[in-house]
Design a protein with these regions (language model features):
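A glycine/serine/threonine-rich, flexible loop-to-helix segment
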Residues: 72, 84-108
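Conserved SDR Rossmann-fold cofactor-binding beta-strand/turn motif
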Residues: 76-86, 128, 141-143
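A short, exposed helix-loop element centered on a Lys and neighboring polar residues
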Residues: 19-20, 64
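Short C-terminal tail/terminal secondary-structure segment
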Residues: 44, 125, 136-147
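Alpha-helical segment proximal to the catalytic Tyr-Lys
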Residues: 24, 68-72, 133
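Catalytic loop of short-chain dehydrogenase/reductase
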Residues: 33-58, 63-72, 84-85
Length: 147
């Protein structure tokens, strides 16, 4: 139960409070963008990770709900939901650089590769740009087709 409370605090309460701190200024300007980086796992589920999936799913729900609440103030709220992105925290270089290990890691990804951090950065830049002004309440999976 303490682990669940900690996960909810980090993945739901903190983003909620951060968004709440920014919204008054955005409302004054009658414009703004809030972009959460969540996870693709709630879009599909993941055995043995129900606590994480639940917390991340709540963050996705927060994005959709805030989009409904804040749209009238010209504030767009979206979320990028990555999974299977190259990162030494999740995929150590010794595994990524080993063809057998990489094949095992990517076997469930339709595109058969890991995403690159710069691809996530480009997606974030798009959502932060004027090109995304008519997009709100969207959860964008970034998982090579896995979710």
């Amino acid at each position: 139960t303490d682990d669940l409370r900690s996960a909810l605090e980090q993945m739901v309460v903190f983003p909620f409070e951060m968004a709440g701190a920014m919204v008054p200024q955005m409302k004054k300007r009658k414009s703004g963008k809030i972009l959460f980086v969540t996870s693709a796992t709630p879009l599909r589920g993941l055995p043995n990770y129900s606590m994480y999936v639940t917390a991340r799913g709540a963050t996705n729900a927060l994005a959709v709900s805030l989009a409904q609440e804040l749209g009238r103030d010209n504030i767009q709220v979206n979320a990028i939901a990555p999974n299977y992105v190259e990162s030494p925290n999740y995929f150590p270089p010794e595994l990524v650089n080993d063809p057998k290990s990489l094949a095992k890691m990517t076997r469930n990804i339709p595109l058969k590769r890991l995403g690159k951090p710069e691809e996530v950065a480009a997606l974030i830049a798009f959502y932060a740009s004027d090109q995304s002004d008519f997009i709100t309440g969207h959860i964008m999976p970034f998982a090579g087709g896995w979710a």
